[in-house]
């Protein structure tokens, strides 16, 4: 029995998976059912009757921390920590003996050719992507998408592989759009191929193996294979077969395999797509994928997910990945003690780190090191402190930094930097800025707890998010940032956040992170008075004002359309006739 089917049986027995037999449309309806269930911390869903396809669809497999922990039970949480300790320790025979299980895992790295195992796939007689139950998740999506694709490519110069998760849009029966990004492996491989005027072979796996999914999103160094990482975590090699008409290994752990190529120089409008930032990423030209063959298991199950505002499945699997990788950060970046990127902000928008300060401004050196490390280089706001704070409580992190931050030296802004493709707060696609907030050493100020001032012109409501951070409800028409910077009632507050809706912004840490850091760019939206320039930098003064209002150039928030909302509400008991515990 495959890994996926074992866990389907396990979760079904634990009432952590529900079979849905009612007919369900993959166009908006299925995604809305999924969203309601995951919001209520509900079970995984196996849809057996998806309109227009003979294949069942599995969603919400990663929808709770409990299920994620079970899915990765083969790889204990301390696995990477033990490897990091072994690498950084003086080698001793006794320690090697105690770590012999790790050596066994290392012997399991890589792929294994399935010489005697039956090939578990059948090939479609003709390529027709319409037979697959691709989801349209949001009303303004540009079409139907693969939402859990594992896209495999190899460098045409070094043959090093990459397994990445890039969304894939269906254009017609044999053509798709590849949302490759230049700063990630697949995009780099296509760039290399195009320099040689070659087409790039591409394989797309749809797999129920969670270790492949986790590895595909892992921010590994360019020369580290995601497949090797997956086999280390699962403690077993990946079986594969090669065919004469395609250069890539066909992984036995897949449910579907799409093989083809990305033609050199071919681009096509892709999107819009409601993404994991909670907004629509807009239509842009991206590479094409020409599908030449489709393989699938005879009893194939189509894995899918739905992304949007937090919390969705990407949040839980992203946090699991950080649990695994966190012991490696001090090994790769010796100045880092702990580091966390916040899934509530889409991960790349906000990162916080506890660092060492063993010499003058080592913390700055470490901050720059973080911003130069792989996918961490896409970080937009970086919060740095040398205090032992719980990074999973952002309000405590922010208070710790604001107690220590010296405005004339501890705010550093970099303009004209690379930006996450999905983040539209910069001047144009892939362009943005970065901001570093540093709070090092002993506290130098007491932070205000509550607002004691009067009404402020153009401000509808005022309340603190935490000590030292005040949120002001205003609008693009009413805001006057210059007057706020000079307002006497705000002088004691180090940080001011401008928000469209105060109560929704401060109702939870999740909402504060999402509404603040996905709606601003350091260079454009962080404002502060500066008394003078010295040594090629401005000397800032408090308060810092972050304008987190929705701007006209930003994409819209993803929202369910009324007809889909009504349809799902009316049909709820058809999906779940036994009235499960999650809400309607």
Curated annotation (Swiss-Prot):
| EC number(s) reported in the record | 4.1.1.61
What enzyme class is recorded for this protein? lyase
Task: Identify the SUPFAM superfamilies for this entry.
Answer: FMN-binding split barrel, UbiD C-terminal domain-like
Superkingdom of the source species: Bacteria
Query: Does the keyword field hold Lyase?
Result: yes
Identify the Pfam families for this entry. UbiD, UbiD_C, UbiD_N
**Anything known on activity regulation?**
The enzyme activity is enhanced by Mg(2+), Fe(2+), Mn(2+) and Ca(2+). No stimulation is observed with Cu(2+) and Zn(2+).
Spell out the molecular function terms from Gene Ontology.
4-hydroxybenzoate decarboxylase activity
| Keyword Lyase attached | yes
Recorded GO cellular component terms are: cytoplasm
Known catalysed reaction(s)? 4-hydroxybenzoate + H(+) = phenol + CO2
Could you list this entry's UniProt keywords, alphabetically sorted: Decarboxylase, Lyase
Temperature and activity: Optimum temperature is 30 degrees Celsius. It loses above 50% decarboxylase activity at 40 degrees Celsius for 5 minutes, and above 25% enzyme activity remains after incubation at 50 degrees Celsius for 5 minutes.
Gene3D superfamilies hit by this protein: UbiD C-terminal domain-like
What is stated about pH in the biophysicochemical properties? Optimum pH is 7.5.
UniProt xrefs under InterPro entries: HBDC, UbiD, UbiD-like_C, UbiD-like_N, UbiD_Rift_dom
Q: Which family does it belong to?
A: Belongs to the UbiD family.
Q: Which NCBIfam families match?
A: mena_SCO4490, UbiD family decarboxylase
Subunit composition and interactions: Component of the decarboxylase complex composed of the subunits B and C (Potential). The subunit D usually found in other organisms seems to be absent.
Q: What does this protein do?
A: Catalyzes the reversible decarboxylation of 4-hydroxybenzoate.
Report the protein name in the record. 4-hydroxybenzoate decarboxylase subunit C
Give the originating organism: Chlamydia pneumoniae
